[in-house]
């Protein structure tokens, strides 16, 4: 890499790297480093008895701060559990006559961000801080790019690494310098573990189903399309795993579940990412009433396991996941929040309702989609506390069993929390003839231009023809659940690496474009270092200023370039250029 492409700190760190190697120290050793203690455990188990034997420990971590005080140095080491202060003295680390390790390696070649391993004993400093008195230090990894320096005093953070776009793009840095971010993802793991335990205790089986599918079924969503070269067929990234899990119920499993990575080629916002994690579970011989009870019990259990309480604060709202939850039919919900009873309305009447309420709609939308739009625009945001919205119109639910008392409706519920859908569940449709008719209705919607209409999956219908027992299924958005339980209002905060727009890069002319103006190739990196990334930007400054900046960089970095004068720079600026 050209030295001019590096910051001053990066140059210093690379020089330190070279110095370590010259001293015979491998800055990236391959050997295992044995760790027998962690920061939080050391502090928790510290024995303050002055007469007790000093505890010997071996710890490793990243240097997060350092203070050099002549013959002594204090550093703060960050490991997987937290931070602890270490204390290094010249004569302890270098007991003989040769003090070079302390004077050169410790004082000059270590930087914030480096990984080191230290061995020593635990003690309490005169200031009362539990620390490790270092007797041996090993370099484990040299950081050649500086971390953002986040300062904290009296609980207040200064110079924080807080820009959202930077944090999401460089999550590895975010996790290092913002300790609360790691806590979010530790809680995420706890949520998954708690849910998995809840299912396993009841005898349900975790399974894996295909991510690449020939038919993107199980949900109304736009898929990502790819191509299998060997088979020469189009394939789709999974939008849902529902139809495969139901095939397993046909095959004789009483209860199956899967945590699946799903992909939907749709918009991104604070609650949607094109790649997300869902959990779907299907249990034979149950219905949606049973599943409502099961779902609220599950969520109450998860909250207690992860938080120790059922109450969660999201912004200014306090949400309580303690069962039971309120139950409201879709028709009742729309009537409650619009004053309009839509039961029995046809498509034309629903379009009039949309017009009256100011809900956008178009010709591709059928009856179910229109109702969905009304509910989404006028009702959904009002359900802050966990609420089951039940009994959806048949047109909205092509995979759901017809309601046992009203043929216009289906046995479906969605769990609304904080104004958003968290879970979706049915009494599953197991009539193969009815299922085919529902798929054909979806095909008609697709022909009208609805790109979220479901595909016909003939193999799934064939599976139903062999017989599927009465079954209830439930899907839950795991990312949204983690958002709720960690008090986050953006899905990007609970995804380690959320999808991002391409990173913006400043326009930069090539060496060939600079050459058109007579600028030698060796001067182009110098111009870039001076901030002149394009010929046009160079032309906008006075030739004297450009020349002075180039000469300063040439001298500072000892580049040894010659032949620069005011006349030359003026000629560069005046040369014809297109």
UniProtKB/Swiss-Prot annotation:
The Gene Ontology CC terms held by the record are: cytosol
Q: Which UniProt keywords apply?
A: Aminoacyl-tRNA synthetase, ATP-binding, Cytoplasm, Ligase, Magnesium, Metal-binding, Nucleotide-binding, Protein biosynthesis
Where in the cell is the protein located?
Cytoplasm
Q: Which annotated residues bind Mg(2+) 2?
A: 421
Task: Report the cofactors.
Answer: Mg(2+)
Catalytic activity reads: tRNA(Lys) + L-lysine + ATP = L-lysyl-tRNA(Lys) + AMP + diphosphate
InterPro entries to which the protein is assigned, alphabetical: Aa-tRNA-synt_II (IPR004364), aa-tRNA-synth_II (IPR006195), aa-tRNA-synth_II/BPL/LPL (IPR045864), Lys-tRNA-ligase_II (IPR002313), Lys-tRNA-ligase_II_N (IPR044136), Lys-tRNA-synth_II_C (IPR018149), NA-bd_OB-fold (IPR012340), NA-bd_OB_tRNA (IPR004365)
The family database entries (Pfam families) matched by this protein are listed as:
tRNA-synt_2, tRNA_anti-codon
Q: Does the keyword Protein biosynthesis apply?
A: yes
What is a single molecular function from GO for this protein? tRNA binding
| EC nos | 6.1.1.6
The record's cofactor note says: Binds 3 Mg(2+) ions per subunit.
- Kindly give the Gene3D superfamilies that the UniProt entry links to this protein: Bira Bifunctional Protein, Domain 2, Nucleic acid-binding proteins
For this entry, list what GO says about its biological process.
Answer: lysyl-tRNA aminoacylation
Q: Kind of enzyme, top EC level?
A: ligase
Positions of Mg(2+) 1 binding? 414, 421
What is known about its subunit structure?
A: Homodimer.
Q: Which PANTHER family match?
A: LYSINE--TRNA LIGASE, CHLOROPLASTIC_MITOCHONDRIAL (PTHR42918:SF15), LYSYL-TRNA SYNTHETASE (PTHR42918)
Query: Which family, according to the similarity comment?
Result: Belongs to the class-II aminoacyl-tRNA synthetase family.
Q: What is this protein called?
A: Lysine--tRNA ligase
